[in-house]
Amino acid sequence: MSTNYLIENIDWEKYEELAKNIIFQVQKLEIDYLVPILRGGAILGLTLASNLNLPTKYIRIKRSITNEINSDFGEAQMINSFDISEIKGKNILICEDTIDTEETIKLAKKYLSEYKPNKIYIATLYNFSKNYDYISGKKMDEHKWVVFPWERKLVQNEN
């Protein structure tokens, strides 16, 4: 699926605003483990772990063909995960940067459900999906390609 979305550049101040929105929502829940999806959910996962003092278990799913703006998407694939057997019977929070088609989230939920957690919550900085059950920094109706501060190219490759 090739995309041609409008581009929205996010600075660190905007990121912090979105993360605070999520923290305020998550504080009301009983979460035992954070499960960020690498790479996109890594920074949000670290932020939540620091602010909420929660243990973290990472999983890695690959979906975009490249990390370039308006990249093509492939089928979501589970690449690997860290040992997540400890989530059995626990309330977990999956962390992702953006959710649009929900393909990555569906794969993550299916994979994690095999370990029999008690409850699975989802947190995302930007929710472009029709699902309003997700904990969102911001719910958006119009799809955009979001460029987070940690994704900006600091040095251009000459290759």
What residues fall within each predicted segment?
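PRPP-associated nucleotide enzymes
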Residues: 1-159
